[in-house]
């Protein structure tokens, strides 16, 4: 259980009789090197790719909830390329702040032992008011930690890496749609 998050890209590949040959798409789906018997390439309309998967990166979930067009309440969001560019910019800004931030130790609930809560020390970033304005942790049932710590930073770094690669791809034609989906 927990917050599972997916960024997907759908590319429109339907062929029309009025399209010139150089604009036609060719789709092949193979399994074990053999054409898949239940998929008719002539009927394929979209190709859907998983751009990124996150696990309990609640600050990213909160960003999508607050900055994109909601399709299903708190679960599915429609995105434009510009949304990904903005998320990338925000992540870079947060990473820059964290690169110069000091750390401190904080006690948090570590779990239960003999029927009682116990506390553990965790290292967190200090003086992170700016980070809280840009990408604050988002609370939710099984959403993960609300600390600005090294795990938070790793989620930001991985998001930057994936979004930079995605946004570096050429814009070809039309028909590319992005969608964010979360479940918990």
Place the predicted regions along the sequence by residue.
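Acidic (Asp/Glu-rich) sequence patches and key acidic residues
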Residues: 1-184
């Amino acid at each position: 259980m927990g917050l599972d998050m997916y960024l997907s890209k759908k590319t429109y590949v339907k062929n029309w009789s009025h399209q010139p040959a150089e604009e036609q798409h060719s789709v092949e789906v193979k399994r074990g090197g053999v054409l898949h018997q239940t998929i008719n390439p002539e009927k394929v309309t979209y190709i859907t790719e998983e751009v990124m998967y996150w696990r309990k990166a609640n600050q990213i979930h909160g960003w999508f909830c607050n900055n994109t067009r909601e399709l299903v309440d708190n679960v599915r969001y429609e995105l434009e390329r510009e949304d990904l560019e903005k998320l990338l910019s925000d992540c870079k800004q947060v990473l820059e702040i964290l690169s110069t931030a000091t750390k401190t130790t904080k006690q948090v609930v570590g779990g239960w032992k003999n029927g009682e809560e116990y506390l553990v020390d965790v290292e967190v970033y200090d003086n992170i008011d700016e980070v809280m304005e840009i990408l604050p942790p988002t609370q939710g049932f099984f959403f993960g930690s609300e600390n600005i710590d090294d795990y938070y930073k790793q989620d930001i770094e991985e998001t930057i890496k994936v979004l930079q690669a995605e946004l570096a791809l050429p814009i070809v034609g039309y028909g590319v749609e992005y969608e964010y989906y979360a479940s918990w």
